[in-house]
């Protein structure tokens, strides 16, 4: 176990010299990132640079990392969904992730480190982290309902999101490693189906 903000992570990666590196470490709470931009940058950008430097030193075949669909915050969705070339983040969190994607492209061009970027939509499933300042929707709803309370909604129940099961996400993680055609590509990970908060509440 090592903190990616510590440059020692470069030594660890170089020592074990894996063929592939999955990089999912970082700050994921929009609210925490907005409250402390320094920590957000330290974790999501500077920490990621340490990981990528380690990958370069170890001649890793490819780094597969988590970006976010939040980079589409200010983009207009077409009938076919969001295009992976789009990016217009508005929060500190999504901006750090957009920077990470640009860094990965730069490392590929200048240092030969191949990558696969994964833009997750709303991932749900077992072991979801509910300890954040504001829990993810699924976990937050379940906690409230189990406690005998109505779920808390910021805004209205008409808000719709694309929810994807963590098992499907993990299956794609493996596919990325096994299929070299995913190298130096960016993928949206979602179902393409929107569910509003009222339907989600009734489902739970």
Q: What is the predicted role of each segment?
A:
Residues 59-63, 112-114, 150, 156, ...:
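Active-site loop of short-chain dehydrogenase/reductase
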Residues 68:
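Residue(s) in the substrate-gating loop at a strand-loop-helix junction
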